[in-house]
């Protein structure tokens, strides 16, 4: 598969991930954690563990909710979560915190090649750049879902 085809497949996987995130009504987040994730204040070193927990709650919320074990999420899904939930001021930090994931194609083919934070960041930027319509109203959509669940 050519490099451009690989990129297109990865991008389409990220688009599908965003649609999956939008369809999911299960987030293992409190209102405070959601505000922490989406606010425009820069995360500092002491925020690292809270930031990781909040991002992982978005990635694994449904599995955690029903009590199933977690399995490694692919880069496309993690980048979609970061693009969808994390305020732009913290995207680089989120990518650093979540580095080590692998692309879907590598998981399927049994190839181990964890991505670096810089690669996750670049892919997250591609996801944000190509999906302004899907990402633009994320905070409003999620707040409505949290209110419907009685969390907010």
From Swiss-Prot:
- Output the Gene Ontology cellular-component terms: host cell cytoplasm
Q: List localization entries.
A: Host cytoplasm
Chief localization class?
host cell
Q: Which Pfam families match?
A: gpD
Query: Does the record's keyword annotation contain Disulfide bond?
Result: no
Keywords carried by this UniProt record: Host cytoplasm, Viral capsid assembly, Viral release from host cell
* GO BP field: viral procapsid maturation
Q: SUPFAM superfamilies from the xrefs?
A: Scaffolding protein gpD of bacteriophage procapsid
Claim: GTP-binding is one of the keywords in the record: no
Assembly with partners or alone = Component of the procapsid particle composed of 60 copies of the internally located B, 240 copies of the external scaffolding protein D, 60 copies of each of the viral structural proteins F and G, and 12 copies of protein H.
Task: Report the function annotation for this chain.
Answer: Assembles the procapsid by joining twelve 12S pre-assembly complex into a T=1 icosahedral particle, called 108S procapsid. Ten proteins D bind each 12S complex, which are formed by three pentamers of F, G, B protein and a H protein. The scaffolding protein is released from the provirion after genome packaging to form the mature virion.
Family per UniProt? Belongs to the microvirus D protein family.
UniProt protein name: External scaffolding protein D
**Species assigned in the record:** Escherichia phage G4 (Bacteriophage G4)
